């Protein structure tokens, strides 16, 4: 069905880019079916077809470590707790707002204390999402969002001077942590 819709649209094109978001490195991705489909359509139309693997090259890798910098317990017990983190949805992980999507939290239990994680910026929508915690998080607690390697190089911003996270390589066997790149206010200033 997709083929029948696509062919009339691209038959007079030299090339087309079908974009990113193709998780071609996932174990369950039907890569052979995709190759067959793309080759068949390309041969029938003489149109060169491009796809962008995008995040597939780093899928399921990298963590974004942050810290709880403030905490609010609402007076209404039905409302969730709110933890402000040093991770900004708008500056560090904008797909949370744009896609929208909710990144996985390391060691999140199925049930627990419901906590909304928010960012430090002035943006009202700087919200990462609602998560379960075994214990109510405290100021200074660290959290880790999973599958975040694709944000180390693209889509980050210094929105209102929010500092970007450092990029580090961690060796899980030796527990060695090597900082590759750190950012400062000077980096923000130099972009202006």
Task: Kindly give the residue locations of the regions a language model identified.
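Active-site loop/helix belt of alpha/beta enzymes
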Residues: 1-73, 160
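Charged (often Lys/Glu-rich) extended helix/loop segments that serve as interaction or gating elements
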Residues: 48-192
């Amino acid at each position: 069905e997709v083929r029948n819709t696509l062919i009339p649209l691209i038959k007079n094109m030299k090339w087309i880019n079908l974009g990113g978001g193709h998780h071609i490195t996932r174990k369950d991705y039907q890569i052979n079916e995709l190759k067959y489909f793309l080759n068949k359509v390309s041969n029938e139309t003489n149109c060169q077809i491009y796809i962008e693997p995008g995040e597939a090259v780093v899928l399921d890798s990298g963590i974004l470590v942050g810290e709880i910098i403030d905490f609010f317990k609402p007076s209404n017990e039905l409302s969730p707790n709110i933890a402000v983190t040093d991770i900004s949805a708008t500056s560090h992980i904008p797909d949370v707002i744009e896609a929208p999507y909710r990144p996985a939290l390391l060691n999140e239990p199925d049930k627990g204390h419901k906590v909304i994680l928010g960012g430090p910026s002035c943006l009202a929508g700087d919200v990462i999402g609602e998560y379960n915690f075994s214990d109510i998080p405290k100021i200074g607690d660290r959290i880790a969002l999973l599958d975040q390697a694709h944000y180390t190089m693209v889509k980050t911003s210094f929105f209102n001077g929010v500092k970007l996270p450092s990029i580090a390589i961690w060796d899980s066997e030796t527990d060695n942590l090597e900082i590759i790149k750190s950012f400062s206010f000077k980096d923000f200033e130099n972009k202006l």
